[in-house]
């Protein structure tokens, strides 16, 4: 369960502070997905960073399964983040010198050497995203869609309660984007996680259970956008 209450964030400027988020509220149960759309500079990435505990709000709260991660010290919060939150970035953030399997196992390294269970789960996820035949390949040997599949598998390795995706199909052609969207939603549903996606793609947004637009720093619920391509 992800519960966001009255979240606000501003940044200092030469003049008045720049208010980016104003009283944001959001509640998602396990298995639910939400898209957040809005123009560049509207605060989408800031919101995602706060949900991922990579930035702190000025006021308001974030709770994941009843736990406030901002009540933890920096070390505890980092450990909590690694166990509870999965990230999918637009540019993948795959380490070029590591194989597909090694990249998927990166979250397990925070606990030391990956366990046999970690390795088994990585293999299962790599198979689930259709890359068993690429398990030993390096990122440079993969297509954009294949790299996105690796990122999805890595995000799910630790069985997180929440997955945060920043433009997961932003660099893909429409056909590949559709395939990746279907894969992501299938695995998210199977694992019963919360999925929050920041996107400019209205067709991707339409695939989510909930759709929100950031307007003047506040989240406004929207219906389907009706975009099919």
From Swiss-Prot:
Q: Which SMART domains match?
A: AAA (SM00382)
Topology in the lipid bilayer: Peripheral membrane protein
Q: Where in the cell is it found?
A: Cell inner membrane
* Protein residues bound to ATP: 38-45
Q: Name one Pfam family in it.
A: ABC_tran
The record's InterPro entries line, in alphabetical order, gives: AAA+_ATPase, ABC_transporter-like_ATP-bd, ABC_transpr_LolD-like, MacB-like_ATP-bd, P-loop_NTPase
Disulfide pattern: none
Q: Which UniProt keywords apply?
A: ATP-binding, Cell inner membrane, Cell membrane, Membrane, Nucleotide-binding, Translocase, Transport
Gene3D superfamilies for the chain: P-loop containing nucleotide triphosphate hydrolases (3.40.50.300)
Q: One of this protein's GO BP terms?
A: transmembrane transport
A GO CC term? plasma membrane
Q: Which PROSITE patterns match?
A: ABC_TRANSPORTER_2, LOLD
Enzyme Commission no: 7.6.2.-
Could you tell me which SUPFAM superfamilies the record lists for this protein?
Answer: P-loop containing nucleoside triphosphate hydrolases
Tell me the ranges covered by the ABC transporter domain, including all copies. 2-229
A single GO molecular function term of this UniProt record: transmembrane transporter activity
Q: What does this protein do?
A: Part of the ABC transporter complex LolCDE involved in the translocation of mature outer membrane-directed lipoproteins, from the inner membrane to the periplasmic chaperone, LolA. Responsible for the formation of the LolA-lipoprotein complex in an ATP-dependent manner.
Describe the family membership recorded for this protein in Swiss-Prot or TrEMBL.
Answer: Belongs to the ABC transporter superfamily. Lipoprotein translocase (TC 3.A.1.125) family.
- Oligomeric form and interacting partners: The complex is composed of two ATP-binding proteins (LolD) and two transmembrane proteins (LolC and LolE).
Q: Tell me the protein's name.
A: Lipoprotein-releasing system ATP-binding protein LolD 1
């Amino acid at each position: 369960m992800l519960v966001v209450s009255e979240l606000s964030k501003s940044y200092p400027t030469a003049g008045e502070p720049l208010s980016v988020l104003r009283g944001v509220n959001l509640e998602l149960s396990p298995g639910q997905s939400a898209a957040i759309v809005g123009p560049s500079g509207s605060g989408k990435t800031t919101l995602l960073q706060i949900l991922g505990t990579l930035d702190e709000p000025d006021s308001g709260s974030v709770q994941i399964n009843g736990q406030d991660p901002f009540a933890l010290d920096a070390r505890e919060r980092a450990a909590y983040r690694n166990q509870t939150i999965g990230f999918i970035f637009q540019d993948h953030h795959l380490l070029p010198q590591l194989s597909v399997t090694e990249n998927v196992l990166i979250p397990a390294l925070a606990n030391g050497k990956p366990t046999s269970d970690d390795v088994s789960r990585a293999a299962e996820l790599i198979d689930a995203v259709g890359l068993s035949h690429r398990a030993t390949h390096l990122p440079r040997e993969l297509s954009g869609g294949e790299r996105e599949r690796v990122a999805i598998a890595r995000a799910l390795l630790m069985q997180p309660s929440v997955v945060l995706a920043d433009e997961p199909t932003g660099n893909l052609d429409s056909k590949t984007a559709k395939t990746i969207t279907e894969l992501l939603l299938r695995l998210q549903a199977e694992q019963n996680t919360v999925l929050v996606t920041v996107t400019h793609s209205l067709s991707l947004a339409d695939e989510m259970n909930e759709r929100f637009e950031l307007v003047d720093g506040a989240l406004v619920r929207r219906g389907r956008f009706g975009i099919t391509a």
